[in-house]
């Protein structure tokens, strides 16, 4: 873990990893926000399911995805913004919010993976590598550098 504590420019390496993971999470929340604004185009891109399908399973899956997208706007998106601001200001709330946001970043791809492994293995693997792996390393990096944060 000492390599995550090595200073690299303005921040220790573990903090850089956390900032990168949080930036990647902002991409995920941005895609979810876009889905809510233009669901039909998100369907055409293949990132959401058709809401008005004749297939009841497809419709149910789309409604579940819409609910997840809405929930992402209410909790993980603001939490990620708070984490970024707090980490850049070296505040303890940044550490706490960063750990929480990255925990969500590990959880949601695992949920996605178990839900869709049989039909979308390539996408599942990409999602795990793009989101879960950096977020897991970010949790370790934040924890390794917890003394770097100021209490006030």
Regions found by a protein language model. Name each.
Residues 2-152:
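Topology signature of small-to-medium multi-pass alpha-helical membrane proteins
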């Amino acid at each position: 873990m000492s390599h995550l504590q090595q200073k690299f420019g303005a921040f220790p390496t573990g903090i850089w990893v956390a900032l990168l993971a949080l930036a990647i999470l902002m991409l995920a929340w941005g895609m979810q926000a876009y889905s809510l604004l233009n669901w039909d185009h998100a369907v055409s891109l293949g990132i959401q399911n058709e809401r008005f399908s004749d297939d009841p399973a497809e419709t149910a899956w789309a409604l579940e995805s819409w609910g997840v997208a809405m929930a992402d706007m209410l909790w993980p998106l603001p939490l990620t913004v708070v984490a970024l601001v707090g980490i850049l200001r070296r505040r303890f709330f940044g550490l706490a919010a960063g750990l929480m946001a990255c925990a969500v970043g590990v959880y949601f791809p695992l949920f996605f993976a178990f839900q869709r492994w049989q039909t979308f293995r390539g996408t599942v693997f990409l999602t795990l590598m793009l989101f879960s792996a950096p977020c897991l390393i970010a949790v370790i990096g934040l924890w390794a550098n917890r003394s770097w944060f100021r209490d006030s």
